[in-house]
Amino acid sequence: MTSSAPGNADGQSRLAARFVAGPHVRAPDTAEHRLQDWLAELEPSLAASLRDQFASGWARSILLGIVESSPYLFDLIRADAQRLDRLLRCDPQTHLAELIARTGREVFACSGEADVMSLLRRLKSEAALLIALCDIGGVWPVMQVTAALTDVAVAAVQMALRHLLRQEAARGRLAPIDPAQPELGCGLFVLAMGKMGAGELNYSSDIDLIVFFDPDATTLAHDIEPQPFFVRVTQALARLLQSRTADGYVFRVDLRLRPDPASTQVAMSTEAALHYYEREGRTWERAAMIKARICAGDVAAGEAMLAELSPFVWRKHLDFQALTDVHDMKRQMQVYRGHSEIAVEGHNVKVGRGGIREIEFFAQTQQLIAGGRHPELRVRPTLQALDVLTASNWITAQARDELTSAYEFLRRVEHRLQMMADEQIHSLPDDVDGVARFACFFGYESRERFATDLLFHLDIVQGHYARLFEGDPTGTVSLPPVNYGAGPDEPRLLEHLVALGFRDPMMVALTLQQWLAGDYRVFRAEATRTTFNEFLPALIDGLAHADEPDRAVVAFDRFLQALQLGGRLITLLGQNRDLVALVALVLGAAPRLGDMLARQPRLMDGLIDPRFFGAIPDKRELSTRLAATLQDAGSYEEFLDRLRLFGQESLFLIGTRILSGTVSAQQAGTAFADVAEGIVHTVHNLVIERFAAQHGRIRGQETAIIAMGRLGAREMTASSDLDLILLYDFDADAPDSDGERPLQGAHYFARFTQRLISAFTSRTNYGVLYDIDMRLRPSGRAGPLASHIDSFAHYQEHEAWTWEHMALTRARVISASPAFRARIEAIIQTALRRSRDAQAIARDVADMRRAIAAEKGETDLWDLKHAAGGMVDIDFVAQYLQLVHAASKPEILDISSLQVLDHAERLGVLPRADAVILRHAARMYHDLTQILRLCVSDKFKPDQAGDDLLRVMTRAGDAPDFSALEARVRETQSEVRRVFTALLER
């Protein structure tokens, strides 16, 4: 059965005998049972062969670890047991080379696209399993793993492109020089960028490609226009590689690193590209081109273009602007990423502090600085760059060795994370148990041992990164003596401001003159003026470090004008000068937060608190802080005002962390919800006591607050209102309250609810707590404000519309006695778990989506909630899946759409490909929505937005620039709408 397999080996050269490592299995009995169940389903001789393979040392541990921790790899194993047997008996390096070569021959022999797609996907599946086994089993070092992944990707792109060009030649549109190699002289070439270009692909990586063509050097038929022809070929190439079929996909293709992707075609002429890079090319594009490599197509045309691009990437002189660009890249990472504490749970090993990106940036920065004059630095792989930098005496051998060790460790962590579900993720689980499970899959016996090694490497990387510029480790400069109050007529001041990076030095000089004149309200106190004058040079330097220095000055000026008592704040900034750039970011990108800081300067205390950039406080810590805030409140009004201040401070601090990039959207949404939940529970209890003091209590009374919508799902934003339902119960035999001003039954609870709403929405000098929306109560506006629990149960069973049960999937009791909570949760579960007609629910959900589109519109790309393919589509898919499947699969139920998608995939009611698309989209929408809700009060219009906001959004969307982000959003919405339509509008 296996003797003729490619790469077949005997004895100690076979893969199963070469394993030297493996996972630590947490529940071996459970994993063993699942493995044996699968083996029992196989043909007996095949099962016996596999059992023989598993007897080899680490082989059983690896298979059990996969069974326990990697649904993706176990799916590959179960899909083709003979393939696993073949791989365990092969010499892996020989097998992979022969697999690629054989697939190339088979693709060449094909004429049909479907057959080519199937062959490429079978290549990817077999290679993915083989490479994973070599990685998990320690057979290959991690950089051999990345090289193998890259070889597969390059081969797949080459095979797909060659097939497409041969098809075009058969149609008479191309006259190739060599029919067997139609890419020769065709004019089109494909650049592999990023990790693919450097031979460093990660396990579940997208492939970043740029496609160019030389219209003056093609083999096209005389009547064929180059641009539309090559655009069509490029689109077909992407489709061949990334379309999901029954065999899966080959690689997700990202074409957005091309110049101005939002407004250019997927294939660009070399002339247009060179024109763009010459006139508009940015530092990040220079850095990206360091790793660019021709991976397919017309190699000669590609080499000619890269030669022309060389002066753009490799500057011959370290001119002032180049140094400024390098410093800006470094400072931007410090401002947006650098304040976050190194952590274990939730830490992003790619872009988090001490992560892979910092190692890559460490190397690329010095390559950009010196590569023009030192050609030996022009290498693509990160570790090779570190070697060359060491040989050239740019870094020490110790730095090279420590960074190499850290890079290899972090890349292995990244791979193991991605192997679990074939998703391009980089963050460790958010909870301790999740990290413990991952640590075992990674081969550690405990979370603690893994955490020790992880933190060691992260600390090492952080230290080297911080010392990147030895003469200027903090990003500050020596400030020369300058008369900052001299005004715009002083040449020395203007020269100094230009040197700092200001583009409008006259405006800045005039503003400084106004500050030093002391006419602003905040400067009335002499002590404040003195402190500010001493702080001004450092302030100007700090503002110069902002992304847009001139805008930062304008924003800070507006802030100073709004301040009333700002002496302490100015003192704090003077003592914590590293926060100036962060405050400038807040003022420029989120005027709402700036206004809050101007009204309440004490909010700055939270930024200085060492805990600010640490872990987000959990519910218990929030409860402790809330209790301390409310201690000794002298009156009901003071109590509510302290709550308002607590809410504003929480919003400000969480919002600042969103802008600085030190919390994820999910963490922010949970934090906003935890704050709101704590406040709701506190206000609920306060109003109960206050109301009882006036009207007494009814025997057996109970009240509960149910959170719906974003609060229920724990996905709140800075501008979320609270969707609430209030339920009550009492002894029907004694409906009157026992107070001085008694009320009866339903009237008592209606008045109570009005008092509760008033506590939240009454406006004082400190604003409001929250806006309240109770329209999701039974019968909506037509129903009473508060509902009896029996009425609620009857309504959900007999009267509720489908959309109301959709909303109920997010219902969460957030304030009630334990017994009353349990009764309500039972009612909700009963309503959600009842049997439903899938087609009827699909029609209802689709009708509801169309109704929302008619009311809200769905054509605004940046209405991430309501746009076609936006968050509503994803939420509706999740809610549909719950309503249809909860009767037979109650474990699908969850308040979070992301969790529902995970459950649905695991339960087999949502294809993995669709789940991946929806999960990735939801995470991106959450990331961007958090920023938009924080920074924009109306519709977001990019052409009217400030550069600070666009820059923050670009980073949140993990895009190189806003144009690329816009293209990504558009493509994502198209994919989501396709999934929605296929599922609900069949």
Curated annotation (Swiss-Prot):
It comes from Bradyrhizobium sp. (strain ORS 278). The keyword Transport does not apply. The keyword Transmembrane helix does not apply. It catalyses: [glutamine synthetase]-O(4)-(5'-adenylyl)-L-tyrosine + phosphate = [glutamine synthetase]-L-tyrosine + ADP; [glutamine synthetase]-L-tyrosine + ATP = [glutamine synthetase]-O(4)-(5'-adenylyl)-L-tyrosine + diphosphate. Pfam families: GlnD_UR_UTase, GlnE. One of its GO terms (biological process) is regulation of glutamine family amino acid metabolic process. Belongs to the GlnE family. Its EC number is 2.7.7.89, 2.7.7.42. Residues 478-986 are annotated as: Adenylyl transferase. Keywords: ATP-binding, Magnesium, Multifunctional enzyme, Nucleotide-binding, Nucleotidyltransferase, Transferase. Its cofactor is Mg(2+). This is Bifunctional glutamine synthetase adenylyltransferase/adenylyl-removing enzyme. Disulfide bonds: none annotated.
